Amino acid sequence: SGRTGIVLTTPEFLSIHRDRFARSGRIGFVVIDEAHHAGLAKGGDRSAYLDMPDILKALGDPVVMAATATATAPVVAELARMLPITRTVVDETVRENLQLEDDRDLASRENRLVSIVATGEKTVIYVNSRDQSVALAKTLRKRVPDCATHIAFYNAGLARSDRRRVEEAFRDGSLSCIVSTSAFGEGVNLPDIRHVVLYHMPFGGIEFNQMSGRAGRDGQPAVIHLLYSSRDARINERLLDCYAPERDELVTLYRALQTMWRSNRGKTGDDSFSASDIDIAQMCLAIDARTPVDERSVESGLGIFEELGFCRVSGFDDTRRIAMAENPGRVQLSRSIRYLEGLRSRMEFSAFRSWALDSCASDMLAKVNRPIVPRA
């Protein structure tokens, strides 16, 4: 009807409802913020971005602008191919208001964290899992009782309305400390963050810059605190292993899926079965008690198998159904983009790990102060 001029949406919503948007005939300009996600989508991160070429064609090929402060040359090349984009504008502004306090491998990082939170200044603490965000927020409320009502956790598992309430409370000063996964701060204008704490090690250079760069966006002095350790690196490596399980793990997972599929078909006659990631991981352990397969490996493995044509997955969570291919034949793992991207992520983290643990503080601050941009 023309009553709405601007629509804010996610790539997933746009992908699902592309035909409805196309029927309006009114989409002339598409802006993709935090566009590095689109450039990294081949690894299974926000895979709806991979639909962008078809979406834009359905919308009548509108003008497209992509914006990000963290885009390497390969990411820019992928964005240009996907969207497509013919012109790149680079702003190499250098920030001068940030300090970096290096407390890597500190004996008691929790004590150091308590002293930061006790200042009452706006603080964002980044951890690597939803469970950790909840647990650390609970710990800080106990250890800094004067600030207990001003501390909250934030992660993608919260309802959108709850996330919005946390953001607004932090913005208006009702909250002074947020313990979060990388979900907090992206796409939200929060200029007056005085402390950013990397409690756990980020997964790569882009994430390091994204998190650290959220400090002091108002131009006033702000501090980045490095509290991660070499122990965190080992945890990250295990998490990344889940995204690209080893061949032996995938063999065990495939045997488990086949066992559950055949058992269910024998009992019910149904060609598909329903099982949680935990159920499947337990079946893997029953087959091989030494397997490292867990629920995270199951999720990644299912994605790889579906890509290779070994299975078909429909629905989500409790409604998910899995159907195995009768005779899929032999297929090389290298034909799975998801598997290859998982291997690439592991290799990239290996290089980042050395930099994140061994670089001097001045070099690390210089990396934050300069945006990640494509270099000639």
Kindly label every feature range from the protein language model.
Residues 10, 68-70:
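Conserved phosphate-coupling serine/threonine residues in phosphotransfer and NTP-handling enzymes
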Residues 1-16:
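Inter-Walker segment of RecA-like/P-loop motor cores
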Residues 120-138, 147-182, 188-376:
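C-terminal helicase lobe
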Residues 58, 70-118:
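Interdomain hinge/linker at the junction between the two RecA-like core domains of SF2 helicases
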Residues 14-15, 37-46, 73-74, 187, ...:
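Catalytic P-loop NTPase motifs of RecA-like helicase/translocase cores
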Residues 12-13, 19-63:
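SF2 helicase catalytic motif II
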Residues 3-6, 26-29, 60-65, 122, ...:
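Loop/turn-to-beta-strand initiation segments
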